Amino acid sequence: MKNFEIVSKFSPSKDQQNAIENITASIKNGNKYQTLLGVTGSGKTFTMANIIKNLQMPALIMTHNKSLAAQLYSEFKGFFPKNHIEYFISYYDYYQPEAYIPRQDLFIEKDSSINDELERLRLSATASLLSFDDVVTIASVSANYGLGNPAEYQGMVLFLEINKKFSLKFLLRKLVDMGYSRNDTYFDRGDFRVNGDIIDIYPAYFNDEAIRLEFFGDELDDMYHFDVIENKKTQNLKKFILYPTSQFIVGENRLKEAIKGIENELGERLEFFNDNGKLVEAQRLKQRVDFDLEMLESTGMCKGIENYARYLTGQNAGETPYSLFDYYEIKGMDYLVIIDESHVSLPQFRGMYAGDRSRKETLVEYGFRLPSALDNRPLMFDEFINKRAKFLFVSATPNDYELELSKDHVYYQILRPTGLLDPEIVLKDSDNQVEILYDMAKEVIADNERVLVTVLTKKMAEELSKYYLELGLKVKYMHSDIDAIERNELIRGLRTGDFDMLIGINLLREGLDLPEVSLIAIMDADKEGFLRSRTSLIQTMGRAARNVNGKVVMFCKKITNSMKEAIEITQKRRKYQDEYNKTHNITPKSVSRNVEESLKLDDTEAIDRAMKAEKMPSSERAKIVKDLRKQMMEAADKLEFEKAAALRDEIKKMRKL
């Protein structure tokens, strides 16, 4: 096994080192569950990386949204540049699952847009897990959803080696069985092409490189990576393992068994519907399943193939579905599961199964799916939490559930290496909250700092924004109706000073890390509920813990239990950090963090390109497409998927001209 090796100019602080040593010892002693309770800004990610290094154990890091997953992926790539850091989230840019609403007799077809880059990264993750031991995968809730059988997937690989003999007919047939398509004109991921004694294969999990095989008769004479765009050799190969284009690809025998099983279940279900006078449901089911069977027999794939996962994986009804966890467990090694922001992530994981089950039961009842589709599901919470792994829950505000599971193995990281204190908390009467906040905001803005305001409703966010605009403040609002790209632009705009105040409903959901913000205003802080719970209040206050002048103002008429507990915890941490700073002569300083690039293409640049493209010769257009493709690959490498998608769309437009 290749060792996990951290590359960093920093070394752990005393508080981090204590947490690292205690958690490492706890896991080595065989404890299944442990919790790291670390305040915002204390360097929990660096602590997590050091625990992995100490344990020398493959790890799966799970979090509750894609933005945080991307941030963690970037950080871990930096910490472990010599190891295999992978990214596994949903590959859908957009996803509308199929559903049926009986009272309206309305069937909603599945509608989705697959992001090719995210699909590549998912395939890269499973390929790495089967090929290497030094793997850390950053994942979202997708890790709990069903995948193909890892043993079947591994059994479909193609082993290539220099000087070995291969029948060309066998090789081409094997590539097709693995899901690769022959395309001698337009070469893309998941394709292969043949030119005499040369076969080029573009692995579905590679970015901008492919594999070239050069034969002398039946003997593999040469093999190397080459750059797809430049068509230049980049690395010689002696051996290479090629993985299929999908985790659901299965061998010929398994496919035949699956088709037979589907046919048998269809017969049983049609008999049930006919016996119960449900002729419409019977006709509907027969038509849909017969079409899927035709596709499976002719191509080995069909739309919605995941609904037949039980047969394709060879499992029994009700059996725990295969998931990303099984790709860790297939080698029999110990591994670590880290649940980041566990106070949000675990409740999200808990609710997945019930919602999925309810929708599919309706589809089965009305003849849109076979009952076996119910086995294409996310893991039940008990199946997830009882996996063979060791678990580490990480949060500034863990729930009672994590603490009860961890028992005596809860470890604290309260001190910040920067010396930053938890923010000062001020209580103000909510009767005049709008006017008081205006006066406080003007002072903060005069010092070139920013303001975050959290309210309870979309309407209030919009109206408060409008009111402050009329008073001359540069202010914007953010809520769930605003898409991901625009949210990113708003956060960027706040940080760069395009405007000074951002108003939102549940700003902590966005995983905001804004060192420029020195004032957090919590409107109607005494209105009990999810948005004003102890956990939410502490998380919201933490947004001001990146700035040396951080302050929180809570507008209220009374002090609720949630407020009281949040204030006491924050003040206790503030006092502890202050005493540590004085003892060690530390001067607090604000966090410094680069502003992320915009996800948008410059509109004027895009329009200019399009206008020129109509008038330019095809050779010039080809050069621009090549340049755009390179930019697209670079954007995808940086996980800037919206930007990559915009570039992809522009490439399509250029090719049509």
Curated annotation (Swiss-Prot):
A motif (DEAD box) lies at residues 130-133. It comes from the Bacteria. GO terms for cellular component: cytoplasm; excinuclease repair complex. Residues 25-163 form the Helicase ATP-binding domain. It is found in: Cytoplasm. One of its GO terms (molecular function) is ATP binding. Gene3D superfamilies: 6.10.140.240, P-loop containing nucleotide triphosphate hydrolases, UVR domain. One of its GO terms (biological process) is nucleotide-excision repair. ATP binds at residues 38-45. Residues 622-657 form the UVR domain. Forms a heterotetramer with UvrA during the search for lesions. Interacts with UvrC in an incision complex. The beta-hairpin motif is involved in DNA binding. HAMAP family: UvrB. This is UvrABC system protein B. It comes from Campylobacter hominis (strain ATCC BAA-381 / DSM 21671 / CCUG 45161 / LMG 19568 / NCTC 13146 / CH001A).
